[in-house]
């Protein structure tokens, strides 16, 4: 049986998403399987992640699926895209989005000026390996590092302050998905700091290297603040654009663009 599903495609600085309203989906659908099929760039629509959202009384919930069908706990670029979509459809400028157990406050100042308060971060969680173990990993692969730091912003990140070649980032990103250090994998951020700007590329667990990562930008900014590498406000630079970061009362606030690409219909054969 073939089912027709309405979708929207958007991107945040090149990090692209297929977004579907849950009301358009049958309750019998395996959402992980659907997301994996939609995300395939050869046989589906193609995206880094698939977003399923639902409207509640005074907030929206969203579920994030990676290209391999696994779920993600947070995605800053996707939240900006969803906030813009809701703004375009309803005119709402102040929007609350719940991801997992975390409520995030979004404000759409203009179509391409969207801020998200992602709350505070943690540098001390049970999933984080000891500093000695992380540095032994770096020594094994002969990484020339300035510093490394684990950050939890609702999802797990390792920030590596170092200048590495693209092929090395791929190798390190893949190696760190093994269970040796991070039982559930980790998002690996490769950060270079210059003139209070963070030049960032991110290996996202379940997705690989992406053109941008909003939660990675927030985590890297928080790490840079803690280590004294940057001050607030700061800019995180990606290949397709920048995010403006600031800290207010312990909360990390991200501001940037979200771009509408298309609306369409996807034919899902169960």
From Swiss-Prot:
Molecular-function GO terms, alphabetical: diaminopimelate epimerase activity
Annotated catalysed reactions: (2S,6S)-2,6-diaminopimelate = meso-2,6-diaminopimelate
GO cellular component annotations of the record: cytosol
Swiss-Prot/TrEMBL site (Could be important to modulate the pK values of the two catalytic cysteine residues) positions: 157, 204
Active site: 75, 213
UniProt-annotated binding residues for substrate: 15, 49, 66, 76-77, 155, 187, 204-205, 214-215
UniProt similarity note: Belongs to the diaminopimelate epimerase family.
Function of the molecule: Catalyzes the stereoinversion of LL-2,6-diaminopimelate (L,L-DAP) to meso-diaminopimelate (meso-DAP), a precursor of L-lysine and an essential component of the bacterial peptidoglycan.
Protein name: Diaminopimelate epimerase
């Amino acid at each position: 049986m073939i089912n027709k599903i309405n979708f929207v495609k958007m991107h945040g600085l090149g990090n692209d998403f297929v977004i579907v309203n849950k009301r358009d989906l049958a309750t019998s659908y395996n959402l992980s399987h659907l997301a994996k099929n939609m995300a395939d760039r050869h046989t589906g629509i193609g995206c880094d992640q698939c977003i399923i959202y639902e409207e509640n009384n005074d907030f929206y919930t969203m579920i994030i699926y990676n290209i391999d069908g696994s779920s993600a706990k947070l995605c800053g670029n996707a939240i900006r895209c969803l906030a813009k979509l809701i703004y375009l459809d309803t005119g709402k400028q102040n929007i609350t989005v719940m991801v997992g157990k975390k409520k995030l406050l979004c404000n759409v100042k203009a179509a391409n000026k969207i801020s998200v308060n992602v709350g505070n971060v943690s540098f001390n969680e049970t999933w984080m390996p000891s500093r000695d173990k992380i540095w032994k990993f770096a020594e094994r692969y002969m990484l020339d590092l300035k510093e490394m730091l684990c950050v939890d912003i609702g999802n797990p990140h390792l920030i590596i302050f170092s200048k590495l070649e693209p092929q090395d980032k791929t190798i390190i990103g893949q190696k760190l998905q093994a269970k040796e250090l991070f039982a559930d994998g980790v998002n690996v951020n490769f950060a270079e700091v210059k003139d209070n700007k963070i030049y960032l590329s991110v290996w996202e667990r379940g997705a690989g290297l992406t053109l941008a990562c909003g939660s990675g930008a927030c985590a890297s900014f928080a790490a840079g603040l803690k280590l004294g590498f940057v001050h607030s406000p700061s800019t995180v630079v990606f290949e397709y654009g920048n995010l403006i970061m600031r800290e207010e009362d312990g909360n990390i606030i991200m501001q940037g663009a979200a771009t509408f690409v298309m609306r369409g219909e996807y034919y899902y054969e169960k």
